[in-house]
Amino acid sequence: MKRIDFKVVTIAIAFAFVLSLPLSAGAQDASALFKSKCAGCHSADGTGSAMGKKMGAHDFTTADVQGMTDAQLTDIITNGKNKMPKYGSLKPEEIKGLVAYIRTLKK
């Protein structure tokens, strides 16, 4: 019985590791994309750079932004809003990654 349990645990750990690999790579890609496309106005930590604050860039760590739906954030990234340019040329999975990354910036 113990041998079966050991095999099940080993398989489960290996499976979890394999599943985590693409997610980690995706998270790294989203982080790099955020730094290249968003951090200029929103800063690396999401609180807003000096220039971004002057232009009205949102602080991604606030409850207001974190309370937006994924669809709302996706729409803003895709189509722009106010002074924020649109990024509709990004792939859907890149935009989804940015939304997920923004979620990690909450206070």
Where are these regions (language model features)?
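Periplasmic/extracellular electron-transfer cofactor-ligation site
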Residues: 31-57, 79-83, 104-107
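Periplasmic c-type cytochrome electron-transfer domains
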Residues: 71-81, 85
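Hydrophobic packing within well-folded, soluble alpha/beta domains
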Residues: 38-41, 73, 98
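Hydrophobic alpha-helical segments typical of transmembrane helices
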Residues: 29, 45, 69-72
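Post-cleavage N-terminal segment of exported redox proteins
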Residues: 1-27, 72, 90, 104-107
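Electron-transfer interface patches adjacent to heme c in soluble/periplasmic c-type cytochromes
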Residues: 58-71, 86-94
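C-terminal capping alpha-helices of c-type cytochrome domains
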Residues: 75-77, 88-107
